[in-house]
């Protein structure tokens, strides 16, 4: 009825969410995690029309994206859902210790959750509730202490479904496929219109080509749809800091008639 055809692993992820009180769904971008979440939500609402569902994510941006992608408007941040970070009055302190009323809790981007926040979260789950943790274990771990998501995956006590078939990608696109190969340590990559390798003899030459390509791309696609990633932070002409400075002078050069504010190494200009 939903018009969805699930792969065998997507079906396994949905079944695990109902067979176990705690389950994990992992996969890189484009492997159908959102489709699985939509299915879990739809099935749960049909089986338990009076059940309470809560979607959570570590950040506001992730929770908004979760709400938009699933069509479920009650997504919130973990801090908000747990009542953390607000005024420490007596009533609020008492409320923080009460179990969450939700019957089904789905947390996205769980790789970003550290030990402290994970402890706060798991201590609030009521008996009988179902919890589904979703994320990409290959992303950078949380800023705070602990690689919680990876430890939960590796503990061997929680059912884990690994989604590895790429769906969210144009038929002719090579980006997601090559990302998967790189992650697996496979150096045999495929090249085409959207995945190109350009060799340079040094960082200065690379920076010059990067800036020229960037200017062409933003002229064609718009500045919000183009991004540069660098493996270097500050060392060399192709580092993030030096590329940012060079691109700023091309895209938004200094104009004496317009206001400029400099705070430390950051420069703020009109436009």
Region locations from a protein language model:
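Conserved helicase motor core of SF1/SF2 NTP-dependent helicases
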Residues: 24, 35, 39, 43, ...
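N-terminal pre-P-loop "Q-motif" helix
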Residues: 4-19
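Residue-level marker of regulatory loop/turn positions in helix-turn-helix DNA-binding domains and
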Residues: 6, 99, 110, 259-260
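Conserved helicase motor core of P-loop NTPases
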Residues: 16, 137-266
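Conserved glycine(s) of the Walker
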Residues: 32
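A generic structural signal for residues embedded in beta-strands
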Residues: 269-271
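P-loop (Walker A) phosphate-binding loop of NTP-binding proteins
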Residues: 17, 28, 58, 231
């Amino acid at each position: 009825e939903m018009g969805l055809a699930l792969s065998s692993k997507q079906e396994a992820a949905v079944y695990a969410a109902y067979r176990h009180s705690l389950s994990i769904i992992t996969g890189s971008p484009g492997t159908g995690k959102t489709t699985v979440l939509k299915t879990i939500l739809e099935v749960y609402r049909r089986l338990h029309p009076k059940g309470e569902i809560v979607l959570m994510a570590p950040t506001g941006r992730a929770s908004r994206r979760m709400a938009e992608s699933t069509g479920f408007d009650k997504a919130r941040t973990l801090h908000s859902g747990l009542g953390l970070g607000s005024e420490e009055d007596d009533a609020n302190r008492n409320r923080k210790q009460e179990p969450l009323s939700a019957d089904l809790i789905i947390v996205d981007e769980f790789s970003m959750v550290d030990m402290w926040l994970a402890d706060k979260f798991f201590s609030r789950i009521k008996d009988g509730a179902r919890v589904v943790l979703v994320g990409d274990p290959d992303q950078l771990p949380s800023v705070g202490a602990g690689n919680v998501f990876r430890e939960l995956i590796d503990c061997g006590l929680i059912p884990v479904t690994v989604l590895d078939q790429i769906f969210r990608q144009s038929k002719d696109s090579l980006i997601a496929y090559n990302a998967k190969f790189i992650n697996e340590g496979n150096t045999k990559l495929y090249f085409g219109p959207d995945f190109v390798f350009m060799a340079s003899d040094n960082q200065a030459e690379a920076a010059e080509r990067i800036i020229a390509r960037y200017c062409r791309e933003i002229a064609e696609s718009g500045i919000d749809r183009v991004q540069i990633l660098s493996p270097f932070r500050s060392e060399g002409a192709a580092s993030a800091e030096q590329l940012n400075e060079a691109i700023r002078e091309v895209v938004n050069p200094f104009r004496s008639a317009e206001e400029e504010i400099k705070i430390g190494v950051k420069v703020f200009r009109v436009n």
